[in-house]
């Protein structure tokens, strides 16, 4: 199933994986997953974290090793409930819940994920997604960017 992903998608997932894999050992533990989830304002229980790991953990070793998320991502990208996941992701970015992602909100989330971006990089990300040119990203623009990945 992972063979349905493009090289670009695989390298993006590898980059995302490394944001979770804090110690760089090639495995994501429940502790590392919890750290990232909490940095995004979520508060999962240990059992929820273990369930998330189990959903992806193909070899049953209790952690997520890199190739494992690829099959999950290929499945998720085909899922019809991705609409709800997109709405949830948008809500994570849209801190003040005004229906728009501002440069400050984008910078905040990316910083929490460990991505130190310059103002220029954040502005460039906004510009790429900002179809109507109002300087922020609305839900429709967000969906376009996420579906284009």
UniProtKB/Swiss-Prot annotation:
Keywords for this protein: Acetylation, Calcium, Metal-binding, Methylation, Repeat
Q: Which residues bind Ca(2+) 2?
A: 57, 59, 61, 63, 68
Does the record's keyword annotation contain Metal-binding?
A: yes
The cross-references to PROSITE patterns, in alphabetical order and at most eight, read:
EF_HAND_1 (PS00018), EF_HAND_2 (PS50222)
Gene Ontology CC terms: myosin II complex
Please provide, alphabetically and separated by semicolons, the GO molecular function terms listed in this UniProt record.
calcium ion binding
Q: Which residues bind Ca(2+) 4?
A: 130, 132, 134, 136, 141
Binding of Ca(2+) 3, residues: 94, 96, 98, 105
- Report the residue ranges that make up the EF-hand domain in this protein: 8-43, 44-79, 81-116, 117-149
Q: Kindly give the Gene3D superfamilies that the UniProt entry links to this protein.
A: EF-hand (1.10.238.10)
Residue positions, PTM N6,N6,N6-trimethyllysine: 116
Annotated residues for binding of Ca(2+) 1:
21, 23, 25, 27, 32
**InterPro entries cross-referenced by the UniProt entry:** CALM/Myosin/TropC-like (IPR050230), EF-hand-dom_pair (IPR011992), EF_Hand_1_Ca_BS (IPR018247), EF_hand_dom (IPR002048)
Point out residues bearing the modification N-acetylalanine. Answer: 2
Q: Which Pfam families match?
A: EF-hand_7
The reply to whether Metal-binding figures as a keyword in the UniProt entry is: yes
Q: What else is known?
A: This protein has four functional calcium-binding sites.
Purpose of the protein = Calmodulin mediates the control of a large number of enzymes, ion channels and other proteins by Ca(2+). Among the enzymes to be stimulated by the calmodulin-Ca(2+) complex are a number of protein kinases and phosphatases.
The family line of this record is: Belongs to the calmodulin family.
Give the protein name, as stated in the record: Calmodulin
Species annotation: Malus domestica (Apple)
User: Source taxonomy lineage?
Assistant: Eukaryota, Viridiplantae, Streptophyta, Embryophyta, Tracheophyta
């Amino acid at each position: 199933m992972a063979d349905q992903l493009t090289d670009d998608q695989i390298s993006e997932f590898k980059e995302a994986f490394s944001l979770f894999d804090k110690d760089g050992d090639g495995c994501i533990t429940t502790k590392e997953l919890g750290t990232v989830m909490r940095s995004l304002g979520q508060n999962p229980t240990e059992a929820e974290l273990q369930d998330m790991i189990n959903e992806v953990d193909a070899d049953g070793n209790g952690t997520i090793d890199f190739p494992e998320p690829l099959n999950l991502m290929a499945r998720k990208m085909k899922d019809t409930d991705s609409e709800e996941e997109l709405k949830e992701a948008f809500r994570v970015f849209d801190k003040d819940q005004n229906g728009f992602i501002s440069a400050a909100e984008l910078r905040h989330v990316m910083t929490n994920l460990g991505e130190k971006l310059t103002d220029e990089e954040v502005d460039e990300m906004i510009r790429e997604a900002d179809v109507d040119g109002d300087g922020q990203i609305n839900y429709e623009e967000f969906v376009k960017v996420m579906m284009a990945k």
